[in-house]
Amino acid sequence: MVTSTGLLLLLGLLGQLWAGAAADSEAVVCEGTACYTAHWGKLSAAEAQHRCNENGGNLATVKSEEEARHVQEALAQLLKTKAPSETKIGKFWIGLQREKGKCTYHDLPMKGFSWVGGGEDTTYSNWYKASKSSCISKRCVSLILDLSLKPHPSHLPKWHESPCGTPDAPGNSIEGFLCKFNFKGMCSPLALGGPGQLTYTTPFQATTSSLKAVPFASVANVVCGDEAESKTNYYLCKETTAGVFHWGSSGPLCVSPKFGCSFNNGGCQQDCFEGGDGSFRCGCRPGFRLLDDLVTCASRNPCSSNPCTGGGMCHSVPLSENYTCHCPRGYQLDSSQVHCVDIDECEDSPCDQECINTPGGFHCECWVGYQSSGSKEEACEDVDECTAAYSPCAQGCTNTDGSFYCSCKEGYIMSGEDSTQCEDIDECLGNPCDTLCINTDGSFRCGCPAGFELAPNGVSCTRGSMFSELPARPPQKEDKGDGKESTVPLTEMPGSLNGSKDVSNRAQTTDLSIQSDSSTASVPLEIEVSSEASDVWLDLGTYLPTTSGHSQPTHEDSVPAHSDSDTDGQKLLLFYILGTVVAISLLLALALGLLIYLKRKAKKEEIKEKKAQNAADSYSWIPERAESRAPENQYSPTPGTDC
C-alpha cells in the first residue's frame, strides 16, 4: 500500500511539472472517449502533428457536427487565455490532409482528403470554399475563425485548405493547432463534499481543474480543508472491470459535518440526503440507480448512456439491463459489437473500372478517356474525342480505346506542346527545284525566270515558246539583180539553257543583230552573273558572214525577218556589251602593265644593292699608328705586273 501510494504521489508530482509549461498555452475538453486540446503556436502542419504525436495523439479530427462542437469549445477556452494582438482571422491546423499525387474528388464530402490518424471517411464536411483541383503538391486543412468574435454553436469553424507550410513559413494567419487523444474509457469527475482543491493531470500532460470526463490513467490531486489543515490525496483513474472505470474511492471527498449537503450538494450528482447526526448520503431520481462510487447516478435504461457509437442505434432488451446495437445501411458492427464501421463495398469489385468507397456506400468512376455507359453507373464506354464538335486536333484525329492521337497531312509536321497542331514544312529548304522554288501550304512548286518554262518533270526549266520563234540571226536579203530581194533562211537558236539552280541574278537571253556593209550576223547572247562569283560568262551563237550580203544557213529551217526596231535594240545592247568587254580589257591591261612595272623596279633595286655591297666590302677604317711601312692593300698592283 505504501508503494502504491508513493507511486501515485510520484506520478502526480511529475505530471504537475510536465504540465506547468503548457498550462497557460492550451485548453482541454474531454467528451465520450476522447480529449481535445487547443494550442497557440505558429507551426507548420508537420510540426503541429509532431507536437501532438509526442504526447500520444494526432491532429484533431472533425468527423461530425458533435465533434465540431467539442473542438469549438476547446478553441473558446483557448481564446480566453490570450488573443494575438491586431489579428482578426486565425487558422488552426487539424488532421485533414491530402498527399502529393492524390487528386481532388469534387463529388465527395472529403474531396479526396483523409485523416492523419486513420479511420473511415464520414459524410460530414464544412468547407470554407471549393477545394482546388491540384494533384502536384501536398495540401493541409485548418479551421478558420474570426478571433474578434466569440465562438457560437450556430457558427462552427470552417475548413480551409492550403499548403502545409514549412518551419520558416508556416502559412498565412496560422495561429495554432488542435490535438485529439483517444482513450479506452473515462472516469466521472471527483466530487468534493466540502472545502478543498482538485487538480487533474492527464496522460497527455495537461493540467486542469474542471473536466466533464477524466481520461483513463489520469491522476487527481485533492487537497481538503483550510490551508492550515490541508491534506493532499492522490487518486488514479483505472479500469475496475471490463468497460468500467473508477477512481477507487467511495463517497464524496473532503466531507465536513459542518456543511453537510449545503456545500456543493454534498458532492452528490442528483440528490443529497442529510442524517440527524450531521451525516448525509447521495441518492438518485426514479429511473436511475446509484453507482459504486456512491455519488454518481446511472439510468436504469441501458441505452440512456448512448453506448452505441459510429452511428449505431441502441435497442434495450425488455426486462433486463442488456441492449443491442444496430448499424445503418452500409455499416456493420466491429468486434466490440457497439461500434459501427463502414463496409468496403469495393472489395467485391462492383465497378467496371474504378471503385471509390464512401461512408455507407460507394460509387464508380471511369478512367480518363471513358465515360459512364447510359443509366449503368458501373459500366464505362470509350469517349470519342475525335467527334467533329470536340476534336482537339488541327487536321487528322484517330480515336483509340481511352485516348486518341493526331496526325497531319502530307507536307505538314506535328507541332505544339500537346502535339495537336500542324505546321507547314518548307520544302524549299532542301532545294528541290533547279531554279525557283515557291513554298505553299502543305506543298511547294517550282518556277522559272522569264522566257523559260517548266519541264515535264516539274523541276527543271527549258527555253520557252518565245525562244523557239526567234531566229538565231535576222533574215538576210539577197539581191538577184532584178531589183527584188528574197529572204534567206537563218540558223536556229541553240537548244537548252546551261543548268543553274541559282537563277535569281540571271539576265534574260536577247538576240542581238550586227549589221555591216557586207553582211548582217545575228548573235544570240546569254549573260549570267553568278551571286557567288564576279566573273561574267557569255554563251554566244556565232554565225559566219557571207561575202555578198548573203548569209549561209546552218540549218534547213527558215524564220521570218526581224523588224527594224528589233535590230536597233539589238545593236544598242551589243554596244553596251562590247563597251563592257573593252573596259574590262583595259583594266586587265592596266593591271598587267602595273605588275610589269613593279617587277622591273624591284629588279633594278636588287642590282643596285648588290653593287653597293661589293664596293663596301673592299674598304675598312684603319686607326693611325706609327709603322715602318704602309699596310697591304689587296687592290695595290703587284710588283712586276700591271695589276
From Swiss-Prot:
Mod. after translation: N- and O-glycosylated. Phosphorylated on Tyr-619 and Tyr-635 by SRC; these phosphorylations promote endothelial cell adhesion and migration.
Main location: membrane
Keyword rRNA-binding listed: no
Membrane topology classification: Single-pass type I membrane protein
Pfam families noted in UniProt: cEGF, EGF_CA, Lectin_C
Molecular function as annotated in GO: calcium ion binding; carbohydrate binding; complement component C1q complex binding; signaling receptor activity
GO cellular component labels: cell surface; cytoplasmic vesicle; plasma membrane
Region described as Disordered: 469-517, 606-643
SMART domains: CLECT (SM00034), EGF (SM00181), EGF_CA (SM00179)
Residues found modified as Phosphotyrosine: 619, 635
GO BP annotations, alphabetical order: angiogenesis; cell-cell adhesion
Protein name: Complement component C1q receptor
Naturally occurring in which organism (per UniProt): Rattus norvegicus
Gene name of this polypeptide: Cd93
